[in-house]
Amino acid sequence: MSHHYSGPEWGFPLGDARLDLTDLYAFPKPGDTGKSILVMNVHPSASENPPGPTITEPFSPIALYELKVDTGGDAVADIAYRVYFSSSEGGAQRATLRRVEGPQAAGTGDGGQIIVEGALVSTGDRKSVV
């Protein structure tokens, strides 16, 4: 996880740390170079080793977290991965990931194939993988 603040005057987008895209990584999948792994870091921590989540709702439930991929070399997205997070319920958030292909990938919206639905978001020192 990144431990830095970005943007003008070290501020966050709209004053909300949950909207701060801190890093983006893309690399080939080990053992299958025909596939890629994409990682997006958001919401920087305030210290090198925070004892837990820095706030009770680490992802904004009104934001769209999105990665767009251009596979045609024309600077227009051909694939989009869109992640929405629920409001915190009982101290936990859930995530839904959609994959959008074709012309709709260049825009925004709720369409696309659901890849992961309602997955529990892991925070703190206990991680879970879907």
Task: Kindly give the residue locations of the regions a language model identified.
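Surface-exposed extracytoplasmic segments
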Residues: 1-130
